[in-house]
Amino acid sequence: MSPSVSTLASKHLAAALLAAALGLPLLWSLAAAVLAGLDAAAWVALAAHPQTASALWLNLYTGLAASALALAGTALLLAHSFGTPRWTRLLGRLPAMLALPHAAFAIGLLLLIAPSGWLVRLGVALVTPLNAWLGLGLALDAPPAWQSTQDPWGLGLIAVLALKEIPFLLWAAAAQLQRPDVARRLTLELRLAQTLGYSARSAWWRVAWPQLLARLLAPVLAVLVYSLTVVDVALLAGPSTPPTLAVLAWQWLQDADPERNAMGAAAAWLLAAVVAALALAALLAQHYGRGWAVARWTRGLARARTVETRAGTAVSTSSLASMKTATEGGALARVRPEAGAAPSRGSPSKTIAKGSGSWGAGALSLAYAAVAAALVLGSVIGVWPFPDMWPQAWTWQAWHAVADSAPVVWTTLGLALASSAAAVLWAVAWLECAPPAWQRRLQGLLYLPLVLPSVLWALGLHRLALAWGIDGNIKGLWLAHTLCALPYVLLSLQGPYGGFDARLQAVAASLGRTRWAFVWRIKWPLLRAALAASFAVGFAVSVAQYLPTLYVGAGRFGTATTEAVALAAGGQRSLMAAFAALQWLLPALVFGLAAWAGRARRFAPHAGAAPPDATAGEKLSHTVQ
């Protein structure tokens, strides 16, 4: 057997073992969840329950509204900031935003907008002088009677979910836009669109955004699934009479009555059916809407004989027809810019975002800064009567209580480190060993935790832990957190791996270096920023896990998330804020370390190094030797 055939067989064997190691628990969990929802009597009881219809409607309304607002906010921020210094600054702030878990963000936002929160107190402080001066007679000594949190319309829940998902979609978009092949194609097509008379903003919306939206289908569906099925955030910010169907299913699954338990499984599967229907509708819209989008892009083609450009030149309709044909056939992707060509006046780096829109990135950053400040200040608040702007006393009692809960802190930290490390190792091994055809075929299975409702996924993990005898111990929790973090880690690594220049491996092979020497000396060092970022993403996902920790841990293990959500139902505001701040500080620290590890470095040339003006091949030759 030749060495190349032996290497290929080894890679296939390793990929098969990796697929089996992941597929077995995933499929087992799915099968357990399927069996839990086969009780016909539970479906009848679910249909007859008076809260089912209203809870389902609330789930649909809040989930769809939050997802639509998050997508619209992402699109506007990209249109107004991509290719400008604002985009670079926004990218630098994304790790801190992503590090803030959903539950911690919800708690911080509630501390801001609650009837006795910071914003109301600030408003009272501003209105009080006017009230005394004008003699308005406003009663400002008690919190207002309106509901800004857990309101019956779900507005607080929508605000939390929309604001929290925008950074995730921006991060997913940045991963696509930073791929050399995607950036090159969009730059060329935007230039061509502007030569045909479209403004920079119009070219972005007609050319770049439709293509980017198609590449963001998986992240958008993940946002939709999460918004429709979230439990911990709905418990904190959502209405309670009735709650969302996800919360109702969780409450029934917590019940000791087997009939109620079966109703909870049926409700979880009802959510799964709704999610599947919406995902199918999105796929159909993407498939059948492409032709309509292209036709709308070149609307007026039959009527207009010429299109006037800014310079006053004319472009014939035959050029527009050629452009439409090239776009539909993907011919523009095969165009290559001339070597050494300077960016044109119409390149996205200079004309996409001029003038308006700068407030969007600033408002998003300000919102996250205010939430973080509310968490930190809220954790040291003592006596704080309304309407005082500042508390009468500051205290560290909440942080002393956190320090006394050392097992909770160490469990949170240990689980996050172990599960994110395992997820990164598996994802790297899979991307290195699995053939592209295998990756495409198993993509649906790998992303299963992203598309299943969180209640249903936690139910399957619990049944898996019971069957394998790992219920209520740290091994079961590690497996559950790893399976939850893995899809996000894989999603963050696929873009950098897919955009890696494969020609570098050919150059290394021509210099007599093995594939593993190339991977160890060239590929992984070049991808260290992506690897560090994916580890940080997995860490943050593990810290944020609520339902898997409750179900698989059987209540024996507490984490910062479970403690913060549990304290939200009580009156210990400072202790709740302290655990929520801990939820944020741990991932923020890891994201900071990841940014430091992935930073660009400059090393002094060693003996025999290539000269600065050497070609890329000569530099690679000196690197691998």
What are these regions (language model features)?
Residues M1-A16, G83-L90, A282-A363, W438, ...:
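Transmembrane alpha-helical segments of polytopic membrane transport and secretion proteins
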Residues L8-L38, A48-Q178, Q211-D232, L236-G238, ...:
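Membrane-water interface segments at the C-terminal ends of transmembrane alpha-helices
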Residues A40-L46, P387-W396:
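Short, membrane-interfacial amphipathic segments enriched in basic
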Residues T52-H80, L177-Y198, L278-E308, P343:
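Alpha-helical transmembrane segments and their immediate interhelical/interface regions
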Residues A96, R185-L196, G264, V409, ...:
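Short hydrophobic faces within alpha-helices
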Residues P180-L212, F500, A506-L527:
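Short helix-to-coil transition segments within interhelical loops
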Residues V230-E259, D388-M389, Y546-S574, A607-A609:
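Glycine-rich helix-loop "coupling/hinge" segments at transmembrane-helix boundaries
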Residues D257-W269:
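Helix-loop-helix hairpin linking two adjacent transmembrane segments in secondary transporters
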